[in-house]
Regions:
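Serine-esterase "nucleophile elbow" of acetyl-processing enzymes
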Residues: 1-46, 50-62
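Alpha-helical cap/lid subdomain in secreted, periplasmic
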Residues: 29, 49-197
Length: 197
């Protein structure tokens, strides 16, 4: 099994040491080749433009595709992001690569306003991301595509953790947040019966 992870800063591991990024933890714990193709600030359109070079040409067996937050923070429409994700999935399937969709963690608006930028309506972004999440789950269920609901993992963890424990700045996960993401991936991989040893 060979896995490529394509995404934005949450896949890249912005704000933490490389070894603490969920993709690196996955790579260190599992006996498989894993390539991190996360790019800080990337949008789904950006991912689509580099999909052939960063995913297809590497000939992986599986790909985790995760993005959307940067699109919504830039004011891009939900339908455009859906279209981009559908194209990314179609391209993977055309090359016999098994796609898995990552649903990004929610934004902590209070922390993001203090530590990231005060110029973004984070509540609106979260609301659009919630619609996007439901669409992803519905689309994946109908298409028999697996997804990893990092949003749900974080919501559950935040019931008994302070947001500062899980977020560097309200947007990007801390080392603990990345550990949580790793565990979410493992849970889905186990449900898919992928070889983890």
């Amino acid at each position: 099994m060979k896995l490529v992870c394509i995404g934005d800063s949450i896949t890249f591991g912005y704000g933490v040491f490389k070894k603490d990024c969920w993709v690196s933890i996955l790579s260190n714990k599992l006996q498989m080749e894993i390539v991190n193709k996360g790019v800080n600030g990337d949008t789904t359109a950006g991912m689509l433009s580099r999909s052939y070079a960063d995913v297809i040409s590497l000939n992986p067996s599986h790909v985790i595709i995760m993005g959307g937050c940067n699109d919504f923070m830039c004011g891009r429409k939900l339908n455009m992001v859906k279209d981009n994700l559908e194209e990314l999935l179609k391209e993977a399937l055309n090359y016999n690569i098994v796609p898995i969709v990552g649903i990004e963690p929610p934004i902590d608006a209070v922390l993001a306003e203090k530590k990231w930028s005060g110029d973004v309506n984070y509540d609106l972004v979260n609301s659009i991301e919630e619609d996007y999440r439901h669409w992803i789950m519905d689309f994946c269920n109908k298409s028999k595509i697996n997804y990893i609901d990092f949003h749900k993992c974080f919501k559950e963890a935040l019931k008994n953790k302070n947001p500062r424990e899980l977020y560097v700045d309200g947007l990007h996960p801390t080392a603990l947040g990345h550990k949580l993401m790793y565990q979410c991936v493992i849970d889905v991989f186990q449900a898919m019966k992928l070889p983890l040893e």
